[in-house]
Amino acid sequence: VTSYTLNEVVPLKDVVPEWVRIGFSATTGAEFAAHEVLSWSFHSELGETSASKQ
């Protein structure tokens, strides 16, 4: 069995709005394959808003 790991850090605040839904998609073309997400990690830090700076 071949195993692959994908790891990517993306600064989401630069590319998505405040509220989003995250999904996964995978394909192998014409062949059958099972894709499993065995681990998922998400971390969020709220930035300072303009109202809190006053």
Curated annotation (Swiss-Prot):
SUPFAM superfamilies with a match to the protein in the record: Concanavalin A-like lectins/glucanases
Superkingdom: Eukaryota
Keyword Calcium: no
Coiled coil location: none
Keywords of the record: Lectin
Signal peptide location: none
Record-level Gene Ontology MF annotations: carbohydrate binding
Matches recorded under Gene3D superfamilies: 2.60.120.200
InterPro entries the record matches: ConA-like_dom_sf, Lectin_LegA_CS, Legume_lectin_dom
Family under the similarity heading: Belongs to the leguminous lectin family.
Subunit architecture: Tetramer of two alpha and two beta chains.
Protein name as it appears in the record: Lectin alpha-1 chain
Organism: Lathyrus cicera
Lineage of producing organism: Eukaryota, Viridiplantae, Streptophyta, Embryophyta, Tracheophyta
